[in-house]
């Protein structure tokens, strides 16, 4: 048995802590009888003490200490020529062995006490601490040691048994050995009584091949305060291999064994010499990645001259590896020296690769950490130097100077109360610690206050001709909006200054409401800012949050001023008819102050809490309908209605704007591709009938994408395309079947059917009123309505029925049809909700047509509200209804007299080909619709 000075010192310190006097004496004795490793050998391996720092600081703890017995049991085989092999590997290195501490032990021991090892097997020549928790086993080991026969058999448990035994594993008390990553194992033998022969042999849970080991020392540990369990730590020294033959005793377990010897080998064999040299070289590489393995190498060099023993070298190499238990057990079971060297070499190669990878990872981490630390220290030094030289001030001083520098040029235009607030906040910021939460709140507040454009107005162009040119180049039509903007510019020219206005554009989707807002800003030369309030339900989006809240911010209007940098931008508030309302407040009510010209000069944001002048801002709002806008808010707006486009207007828009953009998006700028006028008309009439042009834009892009696909395929096939023309017959191939059929259900309307006109979000459409009898001659005279009619339209039906019965008596005194017959009035397209009073004269005409069995005048459509006395009242949507009439092929239309002015304002393109009649009483309607033959 041998021990080095290093491990002896560690054991001595541990023994002193455990107050084990006999252990301390034994360790001191071992220490006195040890010596250092041969210098020449260590220098050859690069493991001399002077090279301790040559491999970096990234290390791993070694697992064991290598020792040797002096019994000379012949396990090394033939070693006659090993010196030459070693010399070739390491050169002519002189070695002087240390003073050997011998422990006499029998060369043959047929029965041994079995010590199961839950994890690592014990290699011959290896020292391993083992924790024992079985009191009977501890007592037996102490008794054997007192008799001088402390020899045991150490067997690795099989996997299932090892996992079970390790559950009670305690802490390793040998700090020195634990620091070198030696395995501490736990053994818990239940000390069960002898059982029948048929019972399973507990020794079967251990591998058959183990290690004959000497118990060098036993140290009692303090009793576990939790379980009351007593335990001790053994120090086992492996000597040679043995095979378990059977169980002799079970309490504690004694097994019959056979001591094994290595197979004979020729040390001069070239393969063994080469493998030995490679093992030594690999150990040398391993020392470079893990310098702490040098201690293990020193122990080996003390006891074996110049690595002349290949079997021991193989065991040493295996003990230095962190392989799993099965691989190490395989090395232990190999009796062939050549096979053992090969297996050890494979494990060492893997260990070297793991060490290199670990070293690389460690190096990268250390470089990053050291680089960050170096950069941090340099930055701190730089700050200190600049501060001493007066080149840099602290963050708080720099912030105050920044805010002051930003605010002073605006002080003259900032209101006095606001300037006072800013000065107070600057003074407050100077007295706050940068680490306090109030410091950040004050800093953010000053950031907003000093960033606003107090009194800073952007340049604007009050040039009517320039504005007209810009508006016409961006949009076709929309004359009402353009005229209103030109009026705004004209007033500004005459007054020399402009005031803020609130203009609301109402119209169906896709007519250009949003885009015209940007064109207005371009025409005026002002900054543009847009935000949508559709679905907004939090009033803080308009008025801002209180500064007491975490993450508080001003509202959208204050953000707009900071973003644009001027106090007179054009602000587009999109989808104002879709404002929400929730528990956070009512944004529509918050807009009352914002959109009131009398109040927005002192708009108060919750975050800023100082008045802000918004009177120079031009607000442009957009909406699809006015019904959902609250009355007080609508009262503050100047409404401009945008109607849908007729077919001719859509053609012009498509040719002038949309088609060119679609070609460029599809990459067809240099390709000869076009759509014929007939195809364009059909595309608009049968595919894109909505009031706007957004759907038309999508269809044009789809057509040109199909053309782009054809061009790309032709280029791939090296085919030449002269030109591509899309005609009417090609539309199905490009955009599919038309979704809209003709509006006309009847070519010739029968009695009881009349064509009406309706306004929809799509612009306008024709609406058929159908009436038929369900019962006759029973005197009921009831009326039933269907077609998903709203309450107002149902009331119009009732009024029409009542009025028609009296009117029929005047025109046809003997006709009792309406009095005796139950009627059913239906409005087709039953899935579409319908409401409004404008179908009054249409329903009345339908009832009279059925009662008198007379069809209405061909190609006639009408709209108007009817009273009980027969008066016809004005309705809305004249332009949309007129467009719908033209699209359906109507030639004659009837409007209320009150809508004559609206009709006269329509362009000639819309009125062309229509014969309009304006009526004030139903009698005039009757003459045009049912008595037209007599009047003509």
Curated annotation (Swiss-Prot):
Domain named Lon proteolytic: residues: 748-932
SUPFAM superfamilies, sorted: P-loop containing nucleoside triphosphate hydrolases, PUA domain-like, Ribosomal protein S5 domain 2-like
Residues spanning the membrane: none
Domain Lon N-terminal: 112-352
Cross-referenced InterPro entries: AAA+_ATPase (IPR003593), ATPase_AAA_core (IPR003959), Lon_bac/euk-typ (IPR004815), Lon_lid (IPR054594), Lon_proteolytic (IPR008269), Lon_Prtase (IPR027065), Lon_prtase_N (IPR003111), Lon_prtase_N_sf (IPR046336)
Domain of life: Eukaryota
Catalyzed reaction equations: Hydrolysis of proteins in presence of ATP
GO cellular component terms, semicolon-separated: mitochondrial matrix
Protein name, as recorded: Lon protease homolog, mitochondrial
Keyword DNA-binding: yes
Region (Disordered): 65-95
Transit peptide range per the UniProt entry: 1-40
Subcellular location(s) per record: Mitochondrion matrix
EC number: 3.4.21.53
Described function: ATP-dependent serine protease that mediates the selective degradation of misfolded, unassembled or oxidatively damaged polypeptides as well as certain short-lived regulatory proteins in the mitochondrial matrix. May also have a chaperone function in the assembly of inner membrane protein complexes. Participates in the regulation of mitochondrial gene expression and in the maintenance of the integrity of the mitochondrial genome. Binds to mitochondrial DNA in a site-specific manner.
């Amino acid at each position: 048995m041998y021990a080095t000075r290093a491990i002896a010192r560690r054991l001595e310190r541990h023994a002193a802590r455990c107050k084990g006097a006999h252990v301390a004496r034994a360790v001191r004795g071992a220490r006195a009888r040890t010596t250092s490793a041969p210098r020449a050998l260590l220098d050859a391996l690069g493991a001399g003490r002077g090279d301790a720092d040559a491999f970096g600081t990234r290390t791993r703890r070694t697992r064991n200490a290598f020792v040797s017995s002096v019994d000379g049991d012949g396990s090394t085989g033939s070693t006659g020529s090993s010196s030459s092999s070693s010399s070739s590997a390491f050169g002519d290195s002189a070695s002087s062995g240390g003073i050997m501490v011998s422990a006499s032990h029998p060369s043959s021991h047929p029965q041994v006490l079995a010590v199961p090892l839950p994890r690592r097997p014990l290699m011959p020549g290896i020292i391993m601490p083992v924790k024992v928790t079985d009191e009977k086993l501890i007592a037996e080991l102490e008794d054997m040691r007192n008799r001088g026969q402390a020899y045991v058999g150490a067997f690795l448990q099989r996997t299932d048994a090892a996992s079970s035994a390790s559950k009670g594993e305690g802490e390793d008390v040998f700090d020195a050995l634990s620091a070198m990553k030696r395995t501490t194992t736990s053994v818990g033998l239940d000390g069960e009584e002898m059982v029948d022969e048929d019972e399973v042999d507990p020794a079967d849970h251990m591998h058959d091949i183990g290690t004959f080991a000497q118990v060098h020392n036993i140290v009692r540990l303090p009793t576990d305060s939790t379980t009351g369990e007593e335990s001790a730590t053994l120090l086992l020294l492996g000597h040679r291999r043995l095979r378990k033959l059977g169980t002799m005793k079970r309490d504690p377990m004694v097994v019959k064994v056979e001591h094994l010897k290595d197979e004979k080998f020729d040390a001069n064999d070239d393969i063994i010499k080469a493998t030995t040299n490679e093992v030594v070289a690999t150990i040398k590489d391993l020392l470079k990645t893990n310098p702490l393995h040098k201690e293990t190498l020193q122990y080996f060099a003390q006891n074996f001259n110049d690595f002349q023993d290949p079997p021991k070298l193989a065991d040493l190499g295996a003990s230095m590896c962190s392989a799993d238990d099965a691989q190490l057990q395989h090395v232990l079971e190999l009796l062939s020296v050549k096979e053992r060297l090969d297996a050890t070499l494979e494990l060492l190669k893997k260990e070297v690769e793991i060490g290199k990878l670990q070293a690389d990872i460690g190096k990268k981490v250390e470089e990053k950490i050291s680089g960050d630390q170096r950069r941090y220290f340099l930055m701190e030094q730089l700050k200190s130097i600049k501060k001493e030289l007066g080149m840099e001030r602290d963050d708080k001083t720099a912030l105050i100077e920044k805010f002051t520098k930003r605010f002073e040029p605006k002080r003259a235009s900032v209101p006095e109360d606001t300037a006072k607030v800013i000065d107070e906040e600057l003074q407050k910021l100077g007295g706050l610690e940068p680490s306090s939460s109030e410091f950040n709140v004050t800093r953010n507040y000053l950031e907003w206050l000093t960033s606003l454009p107090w009194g800073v107005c952007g340049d604007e162009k009050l040039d009517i001709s320039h504005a007209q040119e810009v508006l016409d180049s961006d949009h076709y039509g929309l004359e009402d909006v353009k005229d209103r903007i030109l009026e705004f510019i004209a007033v500004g020219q005459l007054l020399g200054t402009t005031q803020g206005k609130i203009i609301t554009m109402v119209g169906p989707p896709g007519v250009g409401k949003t885009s015209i807002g940007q064109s207005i800003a371009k025409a005026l030369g002002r900054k543009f800012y847009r935000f949508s309030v559709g679905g907004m339900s939090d009033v803080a989006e308009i008025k801002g949050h209180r500064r007491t809240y975490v993450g508080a911010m001003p509202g959208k209007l204050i953000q707009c001023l900071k973003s644009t940098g001027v106090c007179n931008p054009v602000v587009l508030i999109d989808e104002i008819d879709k404002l929400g309302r929730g528990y956070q407040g009512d944004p529509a009510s918050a807009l009352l102050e914002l959109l009131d010209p009398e109040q927005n000069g002192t708009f108060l944001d919750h975050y800023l809490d100082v008045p802000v002048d918004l009177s120079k801002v031009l607000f442009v709002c957009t909406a699809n309908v006015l019904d959902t806008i609250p009355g007080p808010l609508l009262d503050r707006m100047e409404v401009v209605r945008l109607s849908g486009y007729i077919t001719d207007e859509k053609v012009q828009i498509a040719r002038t704007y949309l088609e060119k953009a679609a070609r460029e998006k599809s990459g067809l700028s240099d390709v000869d591709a076009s759509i014929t006028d007939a195809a364009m008309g059909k595309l608009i009439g049968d595919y894109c009938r909505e009031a706007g042009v957004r759907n038309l834009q999508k269809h044009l892009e789809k057509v040109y994408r199909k053309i782009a696909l054809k061009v790309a395929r032709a280029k791939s096939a090296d085919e030449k395309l002269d030109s591509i023309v899309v005609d009417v017959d090609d539309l199905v191939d490009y955009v599919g079947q038309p979704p809209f059929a003709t509006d006309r259900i009847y070519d010739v309307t029968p009695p009881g059917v009349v064509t009406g006109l309706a306004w929809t979000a799509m612009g306008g459409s024709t609406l058929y009123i159908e009436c038929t009898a369900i019962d006759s001659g029973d005197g009921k005279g009831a009326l039933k309505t269907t077609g998903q009619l709203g309450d107002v339209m149902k009331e119009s039906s009732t009024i029409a029925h009542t009025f028609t019965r009296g009117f029929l008596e005047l025109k046809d005194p003997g006709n009792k049809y309406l009095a005796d017959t139950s009627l059913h009035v239906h409005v087709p397209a039953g899935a579409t909700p319908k409401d409004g009073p404008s179908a009054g004269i249409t329903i009345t005409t339908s009832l009279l047509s059925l009662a008198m069995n007379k069809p209405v005048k061909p190609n006639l459509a009408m709209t108007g509200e009817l009273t009980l006395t027969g008066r016809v009242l004005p309705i809305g949507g004249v332009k949309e209804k007129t467009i719908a009439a033209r699209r359906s092929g109507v030639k004659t239309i009837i409007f209320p007299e009150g809508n004559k002015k609206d009709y006269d304002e329509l362009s000639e393109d819309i009125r062309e080909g229509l014969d309009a009649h304006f009526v004030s009483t139903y009698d005039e309607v009757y003459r045009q619709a049912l008595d037209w033959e007599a009047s003509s």
